[in-house]
Amino acid sequence: METLLGLLILWLQLQWVSSKQEVTQIPAALSVPEGENLVLNCSFTDSAIYNLQWFRQDPGKGLTSLLLIQSSQREQTSGRLNASLDKSSGRSTLYIAASQPGDSATYLCAVR
């Protein structure tokens, strides 16, 4: 069983290393007045993805998942958050409606 687990970990590492996916977020930093809508963009180079996920990270804390969009979906909504996915253009956008002081955080997108 230990050998199987070791091979599985090695396979996962090789899959990660062999990926040619590049992910870019624009803007790198953003400041908006309270109550304004916030728009964050994420672009990726390979349209053959399984899903795209947006995360939030508060200072000194771990990542919190916000929205997960499967490759077959075009958007996902949760409360004031809405994320869209356009695989053909390699782009996702996270919209946060009516920004609040508590929205101050680092936002990240990840593709798989």
Swiss-Prot record:
SMART domains: IGv. Residues 21-112 form the Ig-like domain. Pfam families: V-set. One of its GO terms (biological process) is response to bacterium. One of its GO terms (cellular component) is T cell receptor complex. Keywords: Adaptive immunity, Cell membrane, Disulfide bond, Glycoprotein, Immunity, Immunoglobulin domain, Membrane, Receptor, Signal, T cell receptor. Disulfide bonds join 42-109. CDD domains: IgV_TCR_alpha. V region of the variable domain of T cell receptor (TR) alpha chain that participates in the antigen recognition. Alpha-beta T cell receptors are antigen specific receptors which are essential to the immune response and are present on the cell surface of T lymphocytes. Recognize peptide-major histocompatibility (MH) (pMH) complexes that are displayed by antigen presenting cells (APC), a prerequisite for efficient T cell adaptive immunity against pathogens. This is T cell receptor alpha variable 21. It comes from Homo sapiens (Human). The gene is TRAV21.
